[in-house]
Amino acid sequence: MKIALGIEYDGCRYCGWQRQQYVDSVQQRLEEALSVIANSSCEVFCAGRTDAGVHATGQVVHFDTDVNRPMQSWCLGTNAHLPEDIVVKWAIGVSDDFHARFSALARRYRYVIYNNKLRSAILPKGISHYHYSLDHEKMHEAGQFLLGENDFSSFRAAKCQSHTPWRNVHHLIVSRHQDYIILDIQANAFVHHMVRNIVGSLIEVGRGDKPVEWIKWLLEKRDRTLAAPTAKAEGLYLVEVIYPEKFSIPQMPLGPLFYYGK
């Protein structure tokens, strides 16, 4: 039997999604909790391996099991054995041809910047703070150069293990909601650090240090050393994974919890 789960987590105190020796990970905590409910070991496969400090409101995973439990048990029972910063939002049975990663058509991320001279005391680790005034309209305009299928070598981490830097960006929207600037980006997939590297360079445009056309120039140069530093992990959320309709994967509010924009 194959089961898919929707997962939400605060990534602040984890080394990232992927299980690693000697450090705490979201995958490890989830597998340990599921193993209690299954009374046997469980291995999960995720849609997107988030980095250390990165959050998710729409992570999707799957696992195989021979144990027959009500879906409610896989959800509520697992939650009873998880730390408070990880939660299973839903559980459904899926067909054998479903794979959380390889069946996905697209992933969607949001990056949240608190753009105020003073830092926030309420959400210090759920947002990225930038104290210089940013022009979100210029950031949005610059981001449109990244739409479509392109070589994202300029926005790719040096240690990226992907075989190709080519990705197809479906949309990139930068909007302001009072002191919050939200970057919303969807693509078929992302190279390592792609969203945070894009944000870092768009901040240069928003601050006025670089022209809008600089982003187009960076894309064409295909050279990571020419782009801005990587933006902090704290502001990044995996908010949605899109699948073919035949799998009937539940659609949840995109989040993060303090922001429910369209």
UniProtKB/Swiss-Prot annotation:
**Active-site residue numbers:** 51 (nucleophile)
The UniProt record lists the EC number as 5.4.99.12
Among the GO biological process terms of this entry, one is: tRNA pseudouridine synthesis
Q: Which InterPro entries match?
A: PsdUridine_synth_cat_dom_sf, PsdUridine_synth_TruA, PsdUridine_synth_TruA_a/b_dom, PsdUridine_synth_TruA_C, TruA/RsuA/RluB/E/F_N
One GO molecular-function annotation for this sequence?
A: tRNA pseudouridine(38-40) synthase activity
Question: Which SUPFAM superfamilies does the record associate with it?
Answer: Pseudouridine synthase
| Keywords in alphabetical order | Isomerase, tRNA processing
Q: Provide the catalytic activity annotation.
A: uridine(38/39/40) in tRNA = pseudouridine(38/39/40) in tRNA
The keyword Zinc is annotated on this UniProt entry: no
Identify the residues that bind substrate: 109
Give a yes or no for keyword tRNA processing in this entry. Answer: yes
Q: How does it assemble?
A: Homodimer.
HAMAP family the UniProt entry points to: TruA
Q: What does this protein do?
A: Formation of pseudouridine at positions 38, 39 and 40 in the anticodon stem and loop of transfer RNAs.
Q: Can you tell me which family this protein belongs to?
A: Belongs to the tRNA pseudouridine synthase TruA family.
Write the protein's name.
tRNA pseudouridine synthase A
Give the gene that encodes this protein: truA
